[in-house]
Design a protein with these regions (language model features):
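Conserved phosphate-binding/catalytic loops in two-lobed NTP-binding clefts
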Residues: 171-184, 345-370
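Short beta-alpha connecting loops at secondary-structure transitions
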Residues: 47-51, 81, 226-236, 254-256, ...
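Phosphate/oxyanion-binding active-site loops and adjacent basic polyanion-contact surfaces
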Residues: 115-129, 160, 178-182, 238-243, ...
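Gly/charged contiguous loops adjacent to phosphate- or pyrophosphate-bearing nucleotide/cofactor binding elements
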Residues: 83-84, 88-94, 98-101, 105, ...
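Gly/Thr-rich phosphate-binding beta-strand-loop-beta motif of the actin/hexokinase/Hsp70
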Residues: 14-45, 193-229
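Conserved phosphate-binding catalytic cores of ATP/NTP-utilizing and phosphoryl-transfer enzymes
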Residues: 2-21, 177-207, 366-381
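Phosphate-binding loop and its immediate beta->loop->alpha context
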Residues: 41-171, 180, 244-283, 439-445
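Acidic low-complexity intrinsically disordered segments
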Residues: 7-11, 174, 297, 381-445
Length: 445
């Protein structure tokens, strides 16, 4: 491979590990993966090194991407740099392996260049490289065991949860717990805002607009117990969609169309520009082929308003359903990179009041930090609930299909040693032999 043209940062000084072992919280995000260390009440974000040619690319926001070039797979920042350098020479890039998990099925394979590889294997390899980078950042031997709390989007299917958990374990991590991402953010928010976080009693709505997914969860928090009572989400709504909108405005204004590596580079440029927007910003000046393209913030917000409206509609839904049970949210907490957009906070404050809407101090790292807190807090309990309905499809006499729900969405999962008993009305089958078709879904009409 040729030498990278990308400027890189050097490795930072290693953080000492205290206690009996190495525990971390990991946020495997659509755009970036972030790791927080559980170090005796401190939860620093690790800067992770990845080798690329003769350089070390170090970052605390690891791109969740994989590249293939010249018979080799590369991961994270190395994959991103390789694609920018060698796109015209045959390098291929998956910008987000996490998006592949939305519709994952066992045995699913994808083609990268001339290589055919299973999604499960790609995911395992990405996590293995992540593990090596964690140990390297802390000057620990490759054989050191890492205990981790990980997270998934709140509306993840059982298949996505399974393949994520299995890939982490196959990569050598010892998984202590898997949490929903909004629950992780709630843990971080409570520890950030309250001095006596073990004596908190509050109802909190988490608005989590990440790179590729949106989740909102209504949590009832009492002392050290977190109960995610209601959850809604969209698997393909996130900051990446806002980046595409902004890039389309740049293309329109500059009369250009970006493809391949140039498009990937420009998406990075517009993302950085998007993250620089403040409540007082009027225009964005974006460098494009040695010229500055000016985009009015008003035009960008008009184009992106439908995405924000879609997310707020889901918040309204869970708040309304919770209020039917005589509950009222004390806080609406904004987390995730997409929540940094001023238009998001502005609309939510208009809807729910300025005093209720809060931005976290670490909106980009709240999930990783929350997971790290859980990793070293055995008394902190997060109740598990089913994220989707689960049932059996039945064909009626007229040929129509009906779903017999076995477990309803929101069903509290039992603790170890407990069982769930579910009673459903019986029906008389026409045959005493058949093929069961199971269904997992977010809603049933």
């Amino acid at each position: 491979m040729g030498k990278s043209k990308k400027k890189t940062k050097g490795s930072k000084k290693a953080i000492p590990v205290s206690g009996k072992g190495l525990r971390v919280g990991i946020d495997f995000g659509t755009s970036h993966t972030i790791v927080a260390l559980a170090d005796g009440g401190n939860h620093p974000i690790l800067t992770l090194p990845f080798d690329y040619d003769d350089e070390v690319l170090s970052t605390d926001r690891v791109q969740s991407c994989i590249a293939h070039y010249d018979g080799h797979f590369l991961y994270g920042p190395a994959a991103h740099a390789c694609y920018l350098d060698h796109c015209e020479e045959g390098a291929v890039l998956i910008r987000s392996i996490k998006r592949l998990l939305v519709d994952w099925y066992e045995g699913q394979e994808i083609e990268l260049g001339r290589e055919v590889i299973s999604v499960e294997e790609l995911l395992k390899n990405f996590f293995f490289e992540l593990k090596l980078a964690i140990l390297r950042s802390l000057d620990l031997s490759p054989g050191t065991e890492i205990e981790a709390v990980i997270s998934v989007p709140a509306n993840s299917s059982s298949a996505q949860r399974y393949v994520t958990l299995k890939a982490f374990r196959d990569a050598g991590f010892k998984i202590l717990r898997i949490l929903d991402e909004p629950s992780s953010s709630a843990i971080q928010f409570v520890h950030e805002r309250y001095k006596r976080w073990d004596r908190v009693q509050a109802d909190v709505v988490i608005y989590d607009l990440g790179g590729g997914t949106f989740d909102t969860t209504y949590l009832a928090i009492k002392n050290e117990t977190y109960d995610p009572r209601l959850t809604r989400g969209v698997a393909r709504l996130g900051g990446d969609d806002f980046d595409e909108i902004l890039l389309s405005l740049v293309e329109e204004e500059s009369s250009q169309s970006f493809e391949g590596a140039e498009r990937v580079r420009m998406l990075d440029v517009v993302r950085e520009a998007k993250e620089s927007i403040t409540p007082r910003s009027k225009n964005l000046h974006i460098e494009c082929d040695d010229r500055l393209v000016t985009i009015k913030i008003k035009d960008f917000e008009n184009e992106a308003s439908n995405l924000v409206d879609e997310s707020i509609a889901l918040v309204d839904d869970i708040v309304e359903r919770a209020s039917e049970g005589e509950s009222e949210a004390d806080r609406v907490v904004l987390v995730g990179g997409g929540s940094l957009l001023p238009m998001v906070a502005k609309r939510l404050r208009k809807r729910y009041g300025r005093s209720k809407v809060h931005k976290g101090i670490y909106p980009l790292a709240s999930v990783a930090i929350g997971n790290a807190i859980q990793a070293e807090s055995p008394d902190l309990a997060v109740r598990d609930r089913l994220s989707n309905h689960f049932g059996v499809i039945r064909v009626c006499e007229d040929g129509s299909e009906y779903v017999d729900v076995i477990f309803e969405k929101g069903q509290v999962l039992p603790n170890q040693g407990e069982t769930i008993r579910v009673e459903r009305p019986p029906y008389d089958p026409r045959y005493n032999i058949g093929r069961f078709r199971y269904l997992e879904c977010d809603s049933i009409e």
